[in-house]
Amino acid sequence: MSEVTSYIVEETSFNHSVRKFLKRWHYSDYVNIQAKHTFCLFKNGKFGLPEMIGVCIYTRPAGPSAAQSYHPENPDKVLELRRLCLIDDTPKNAESYFVSRTIKWLKKNTDWEFVLSYADEEQGHRGTIYRACNFNYLGKTKAGKTLEVDGERFHIRTLSMMDRPYGVEINKRWKEKDEGIKIIETLPKHIYTYNLVKHKYIKFEKKNYEKT
């Protein structure tokens, strides 16, 4: 029996322990996200106590038009798988096991209809995990832009978030041509989707993943 089948997946809150885990293990340590569903992966640790070894975060889509574009029938029922990270010392199939269990939970316990996720080629990710979980591959996005503030990357929309203190501060520094703030061109991302309600109409044709 595979080791991962003994792992436990739990839905929880976006709490301090989750934030701390993301800061340590995710390549983007930006944790100011509005989580809709937070899942943790546990294994038996020392003295039989559960040890957190993974976090998976679902949010509403970051781009305002993404939900409408990929699921126009009911854009309010779209989630984005925004964060997925595990500790380094996990079996090869641990990530796909984790994601598949979160999908199963969403199907059983919620009325969400559609999941969207992106594999970031900037980080060498091409969506192997999503393909293993039977996500649909829809090709690539256009090349994008990201905001770098003092070496830390933020979504480009941060510049227009004038209702938030950090948005106001970053916008002010940008207008003052602060050298600590840069706009960086990014590679296209791979687009993956999953239909939680199978009978729903799929607007976009699935594509074959091409290795490059």
Regions found by a protein language model. Give the residues of each.
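Short beta-strand-to-coil "C-cap" segments at the C-terminal boundary of structured domains/repeats
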Residues: 193-198
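Short, cationic low-complexity segments
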Residues: 204-212
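Class I (Rossmann-like) S-adenosyl-L-methionine-dependent methyltransferase catalytic domain
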Residues: 176, 186-187
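Short amphipathic alpha-helix that is part of the acyltransferase structural core
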Residues: 1-33
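Conserved beta-hairpin
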Residues: 22, 35-60
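Short hydrophobic/aromatic beta-strand or adjacent loop that forms the aromatic wall/cage
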Residues: 36, 187-192
